[in-house]
Regions:
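Conserved C-terminal helix/tail region of periplasmic/extracytoplasmic solute-binding proteins
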Residues: 299-332
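N-terminal export signals
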Residues: 10-31
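Residues that mark the N-terminal boundary/hinge immediately upstream of a DNA-recognition element
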Residues: 7-8, 132
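Pocket-lining segment of extracytoplasmic ligand-binding domains
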Residues: 96, 172-176, 180-265
Length: 332
């Protein structure tokens, strides 16, 4: 799917919906009655969620009859509880987290997939690069011990002996790599590599998704009850998400600028946000989404996820993914 370029001025303005209403002589009170719902984000506000900010700023949810609150996540704000409780209509999660919750009885379904490619990478420096999984043998990798199953899955998928890799427990920072304490880092494509680039440090990344690590990320989850009883709200919410993320793709710099305009107290740096926003695009959009639309998946991509999740100790079936809301959004 393609989108027409959007000017920064339009992003930072009052929104197309409000402008259209004004042109028609309508007052805000004459617009469609609004249903208040919440979208629980998986982390703190940043350009990671800028497509949602665009949908809100442009009034696309308002057009659809929703008053959407964007709830920030964070280390002390897990996604799953508010979705289970019904205080959030939808949450932003990931297939592995959802699989874990379902194994404990949570009635979740995945409605859409924002990140088609998992953002986990192995970051390294050009003088001692990791270009493919086999290059990890004999190297020291800095990572959280909790992510050992992730590394083990990558090794299993690529025939690499994990015992040949030295795992060094580190905080989530580029400093151990820059100080020579490790040879590489397990991190996200959109954060520590960007931080190094902003410091003027050349670095490179090996995207684990390119080597079989298939775990859908930034997924939209809702409960089975919500799917059964609040479908119109789900369709309206996801319709806004689709429009917002297509607009984001058209101008990631404008999306980053909007992020800072909406959340000026979040301590965000504009240039960093611009780089992060741009690096996110290849993770979210592909030939698959160009053919079918933002958030889509296929039986093949689900099968690949099930295989990787099994290596992570999570047994799931294809019915964890429910495409019926997206099918309504796209009229499929």
């Amino acid at each position: 799917m393609t989108s027409m370029p959007l000017s920064r001025r339009r992003f930072l303005g009052t929104g197309a919906a409000a402008a259209g209403a004004t042109a028609l002589g309508l007052k805000p009170s004459q617009l469609r009655a609004q249903t208040a719902v919440s979208l629980q984000l998986s982390w703190l506000h940043s350009s990671q969620f800028a497509g949602s900010y665009i949908a809100q700023d442009r009034g696309w949810w308002t057009e659809a009859g929703l008053d959407v609150s964007l709830l920030p996540g964070g280390p002390n704000a897990p996604v799953e509880p508010p979705v289970v409780a019904g205080t959030a209509l939808v949450g932003i999660s990931a297939a592995d987290y959802t699989a874990a919750a379902v194994s404990e009885g949570a009635p979740f379904k995945i409605l859409g997939v924002a990140m088609q490619k998992n953002p986990f990478v192995v970051a390294s420096l050009p003088a001692n690069p990791v270009n493919e999984p086999a290059d990890l043998v004999g190297k020291r990798i800095g990572m959280a011990l909790a992510n050992t199953p992730v590394l083990q899955a990558l090794c299993s998928l690529n025939g690499v002996d994990i015992n040949g890799i030295e795992i060094v427990p580190t905080q989530y920072s580029a400093q151990p790599l820059l100080a020579g304490e490790v040879d590489c880092l397990l991190c996200w494509e959109t954060d520590l590599p960007v931080a190094m680039t902003m410091q003027g440090v050349d670095n490179q990344t090996m995207l684990m998704a390119d080597y079989g690590y298939s775990v859908h990320s930034q997924t939209y989850i809702a409960t089975e009850d919500t799917l059964a009883n609040r479908r119109s709200e789900l369709v309206a919410l996801m319709s806004g998400e689709v429009r917002g993320w297509d607009a984001y793709r058209a101008d990631t710099d404008a999306a980053a600028e909007l992020t800072l305009a909406m959340y000026p107290d979040a301590g965000l740096d504009l240039e960093t946000q611009k780089r992060q926003a741009a690096r996110q695009v290849p993770l979210m959009f592909s030939d698959l989404t160009d053919a079918n639309g933002f958030g889509w998946w296929t039986d093949d991509t689900v099968a690949a996820n099930i295989e990787t999740l099994a290596l992570l100790g999570r047994t799931v079936t294809p019915d964890l993914w429910d495409r019926s809301i997206l099918e309504e959004v796209y009229g499929a």
